[in-house]
Structures are given as structure tokens and as C-alpha cells.
């Protein structure tokens, strides 16, 4: 496949050597529907992975992601503001901690604008994670379209990674940021 669903994610380098990833998507669904898909564990399992989320600031967050759901992510809910904002720490095996954030806005047409970001990502992980989140948001859109996303998405991740490599000029090295940010 030589196509990509949705706009490419962007990234910005921080002074501490990490990067911030950002994606913007529009879903033709009410904000409450999108909110439930990103916050209710039984709905998260459809597109992201099996997990749990305690619906409150300070609550526990855990999800198993990746092909075969082999990667166990843990964290804490930092922001809980239904149905417009959710932020959680996202701790990888080995202790690398980032922050993911979903900001939702209802549009006048009854759709939902979703801005997703991940901050504090080590730059050496970006070439896998940037296309990875693109894939997960693509899977979220498939769920809204009534399509069951494929269980093994390794091949699709590889396709998207190549497309991101073409867009940002690399396939294996750290990409050049689209902008710089400071803390």
C-alpha cells in the first residue's frame, strides 16, 4: 500500500533532546463517542490494546500495545476532563516515561476534532513511534467506520514507517524536526 490515511504526524525537538509528536484528526462522530473510545477499556481494546484506566486524575493507566500485545505500558492519569481532555504518563518497559494527551473539540457539524500529542519521547525512538501513533489513530478511525482492525498490524506499521521516512527524509535515522520547541 502506498497511501496514508489522515495527515502525517508532526514532531518538534525540545532543548532536552526529546521530541514532541502531534497529530490532528477529524472523526464524523459526536465527541462523547470519541471520548468513550479513548477512555473505556473495552473500547480501547478495539484499536489500541487491552488495558485499564481509572477515570480520575491520579488514576492508574495500563495498556498492552503492539503486535501480539506484547508491550506493557503503565502510567497515571494526569488530566481527566470529560469529554474534552485526557493526559496520562506513558511508561515503557525499561522506565522511559513520556506523556500522552488527547484533546477533543466538538465541531459545528457534529464531528470531533482530536489533537493527540506525546511529549518527552527520546529522539532515538521517534522513527518507530511517530508512524506507530499514526497507525493507532488510523485503527481508531476504522473502528468508527465499522471496520475491525487487523490483529497483526506489523506489515501496516512497516508500510507507514516507509512513508514517514520518505516524508521526513529518513527511514532508520532520527528524522529532522518540523519545528523546534523549548521547555
Which positions does each model-derived feature cover?
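Hydrophobic pocket/interface hotspot
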Residues: 34, 44, 61, 77, ...
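Short, hydrophobic secondary-structure boundary micro-motifs
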Residues: 46, 56, 151-153
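Hydrophobic-ligand binding "helix-grip"
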Residues: 49-56, 64-122
